[in-house]
Amino acid sequence: MKITDWPASERPREKLLARGPEALSDAELLAILLRTGMAGKTVLDVARQLLLEAGSLGRLLSRPVTELVSSPGLGPAKACELAVVAELARRLLAEKLPVADALTSPQAVHDYLRLAYGMRVQEVVLLLCLDARNRLLAVEEVAHGTLTESRVYPREVVKAALRQHAVAVILAHNHPSGDSGPSLADRELTEALGRALALVDVRLLDHLVISRQGCTSFAECGWLPA
């Protein structure tokens, strides 16, 4: 049965118009974007299959366009549309960061980092550079790693902080495994970076560990070096 043969109340687009986008499932929202299905499958079937294979909506939208193109039910046009949606969402959250105080609005920082980096398959280490009023100056990627780890040199972190004239910084990195719990190496790295930054009078305000499951704050857990 085609979606056009369904009762109007069950069709994704009509349901959205009647009840708003929040009433739709991930698959229904995705189906509206995709518009058409494929031989033997409705567009909703295709959307559900894409979500099932990816594991989640976040993982699906984090895939590169070259990978999306090869997914059943997608082609260059639809893959590009999905990539555009993901990028617009990232930019929307990024817009909030320059006007947000990193200390009084931590959720804006967490949301942006989780969307932009939580689904990455490689580890990335970031430095959020702040001024004397804790306003964001810049976000620098200071290290990239393999599927499981990255190598961070304190001198590179210090150079990035000084380059941005930062008074304080927030360190962040993702865990591709999906577990946002910090490792022993993360704890040791935080100690070393805290000491190195203190030598140039830059304060380490937090270290955030990001994953698709959540975000762990060293500051909230009391793990920052004294």
Swiss-Prot record:
The keyword Membrane does not apply. Gene3D superfamilies: Cytidine Deaminase, domain 2. CDD domains: MPN_DUF2466 (cd08071). Residues 102-224 form the MPN domain. Zn(2+) binds at H173, H175, D186. It holds the Pfam family RadC. It comes from the Bacteria. Keywords: Hydrolase, Metal-binding, Metalloprotease, Protease, Zinc. A motif (JAMM motif) lies at residues 173-186. InterPro entries: MPN, RadC_JAB, RuvA_2-like, UPF0758, UPF0758_CS, UPF0758_N. GO terms for molecular function: metal ion binding; metallopeptidase activity. One of its GO terms (biological process) is proteolysis. Belongs to the UPF0758 family. NCBIfam families: PRK00024.1, radc. This is UPF0758 protein LHK_01907.
